[in-house]
Design a protein with these regions (language model features):
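N-terminal alpha/beta PP-like core and its mobile active-site loop of ThDP/TPP-dependent enzymes
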Residues: 2-344, 348, 358-361
Length: 361
């Protein structure tokens, strides 16, 4: 952090980067332009945050998404006005769906310059609204640091449905170069809400009633701790465990809890779930076809299968599954894990199957 003597002359950009670094943001992936030059200088001044130049904005947003999935922490992106933001939107869509925490810092013209309709002027708010759970577009040099702290907090606040955890801070160049009061302290960290005992009892009763039951685990429900608790429930009750077709992240391989993944095509999903009497949602929604197909239902729940919910996406799935395991008497059960399989070297003609087998061996 800077000294008292330094903060008096600190500009908004440096106050913002100092604040984000104190919050715990360690990486900024940048494709800056003229409006973001003060941010680039600030990144050089704050060694606690590493900056990486990317030559295309989609790389910035895609890398930040991957970083968040692997670390659970937000990275920052630095993008140049509306066109730069637009170039990164495809991967921002993926990040929103994956509930990846991310902070987008988007440079903009000062308010007094927007009216001149310069070549890169656009409605950045409209672009950002498609995938952001938090937007701030009127920052000044005196609010920019606190806005950064609020953006960080927003990325850790789980939101209902598919709103995601992306914060977009649209920063006028004058807020970056203007004199600030220095960095601010991080906000208190948000916590996931916990479900009630009534929900635990209701789900336990459905599982204990008999019939074929499956847990569909998504988002927070596929963390290693959540999967371990789900595996104990499966060992005790015989219920099946599924993740969605494309989970944001799931730890597989030998030693990790065993879980099935739903296939891609709708006919295969329906076939996989055929015979189920009850499907329990742990985060996420009932499985749906990626596209509409003639003669195939959009929601892929077999006829006669009822659906209930243990947790919403924003609720604490680890705690819920742990308490459900206790309620079912499964806390002492052994977690079933993937085992290492020895893959023999292939023989015969070279084809797709033998190539994959050779790589695996």
């Amino acid at each position: 952090m800077t000294t008292d003597n330094d903060t008096a002359a600190m500009n908004g950009a440096t106050a913002l980067i100092e604040t984000l670094a104190e919050c715990g943001v360690e990486l900024c992936i940048a494709n800056p332009g003229t409006s973001e030059m003060h941010l680039v200088q600030a990144l050089d001044r704050v060694p606690k945050m590493r900056s990486v130049l990317a030559l295309f904005e989609g790389v910035c947003t895609g890398a930040a998404d991957g970083y968040a999935r692997m670390t659970g922490k937000p990275a920052a992106t630095l993008l140049h006005l509306g066109p730069g933001l637009a170039n990164g939107i495809a991967n921002l869509h993926n990040a929103r769906r994956a509930n990846s925490p991310m902070i987008n810092i988007v440079g903009n013209h000062p308010n007094y310059h927007v009216g001149f309709d310069a070549p890169l002027t656009s409605n950045i708010d409209t672009l950002a609204r498609n995938y952001s759970s938090w937007i701030k577009s009127e920052s000044t040099e005196s609010t920019l640091a606190q806005d950064g702290a609020d953006a960080y907090t927003a990325t850790l606040r789980q939101t209902p449905g598919s709103q995601g955890q992306i914060a977009t801070l649209i920063m006028g160049a004058d807020a970056a170069w203007g004199e600030s009061q220095g960095p601010v302290a991080p906000n208190a960290l948000p916590q996931r809400s916990k479900i009630t005992s009534d929900v635990i009892d209701a789900i336990a009763s459905k599982i204990e009633a008999g019939g074929k039951v499956a847990l569909l685990l998504e988002h927070h429900g596929v963390s290693p701790e959540a999967l371990a608790n789900a595996s104990k429930i499966s060992a005790k009750t015989g219920c099946r465990l599924f993740t969605g077709t494309f989970p944001a992240r799931v730890d597989g391989g030998p030693g990790n809890p065993e879980v099935e993944r739903l296939p891609y095509f709708p006919e295969q999903v329906l076939q996989t779930l055929t015979g189920l009497d009850h499907l329990v949602l742990v985060g996420g929604e009932p499985p749906a076809s990626f596209f509409a197909y003639r003669g195939i239902p959009g929601q892929l729940v077999p006829e006669g299968c009822t659906v209930s919910r243990l947790t919403q996406n924003e609720e604490d799935a680890v705690d819920a599954l742990s308490r459900l395991a206790d309620r079912l008497g499964a806390a002492a059960e052994t977690v079933k894990t993937f085992e290492r399989r020895v893959t023999p070297r292939p023989t015969g003609p070279l084809d797709t199957k033998s190539i994959i087998q050779a790589v695996a061996a």
